[in-house]
């Protein structure tokens, strides 16, 4: 009897997941995502048909190295950090419409486009001077317009 209990427990362990603070879980059952995210804590699931995807909902930083065009036609190498956060209640929507690689496919892509559009209106010296704050605000505005309706 004791051996049977251990076997039963061992067979259930692959069907457990822990969702940490600062994350939500999204259940994928037979390839379909549940619409409601799972709160932090212990989650039990059937491992054959179900996966638990973890989505960070805390503030996340990604650093991007790329070349910005300037108004006078110069290229300026820059290393820029982007801070973003996935809205917890929209995590299933983000995974369903964009996929698990949402950071590279959407956040970084939108940033590259917005940064290139904005920096092309400024001189190269402005990118590293007092105009930098204004440039940051314009990039943030463009990114917010695109990302706010998509769960960010």
Task: Annotate each predicted stretch with a short phrase.
Residues 51, 59-71, 96-97, 137-142:
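N-terminal post-signal-peptidase region of extra-cytosolic proteins
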């Amino acid at each position: 009897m004791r051996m049977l209990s251990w076997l039963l427990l061992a067979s259930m362990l692959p069907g457990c997941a822990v969702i940490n603070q600062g994350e939500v879980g999204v259940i994928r059952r037979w390839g379909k995502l549940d619409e409601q995210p799972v709160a932090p804590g212990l989650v039990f699931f059937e491992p054959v048909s179900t996966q638990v995807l973890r989505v960070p909902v805390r503030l996340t930083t990604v650093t991007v190295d790329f070349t910005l065009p300037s108004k006078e036609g110069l290229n300026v190498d820059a290393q820029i950090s982007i801070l973003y956060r996935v809205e917890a209640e929209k995590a299933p929507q983000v995974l369903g419409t964009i996929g698990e690689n949402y950071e590279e496919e959407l956040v970084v892509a939108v940033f590259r486009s917005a940064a290139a559009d904005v920096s092309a209106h400024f001189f190269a010296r402005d990118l590293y001077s007092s105009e930098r704050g204004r440039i940051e605000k314009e990039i943030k505005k463009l990114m917010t317009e695109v990302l706010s309706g998509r769960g960010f």
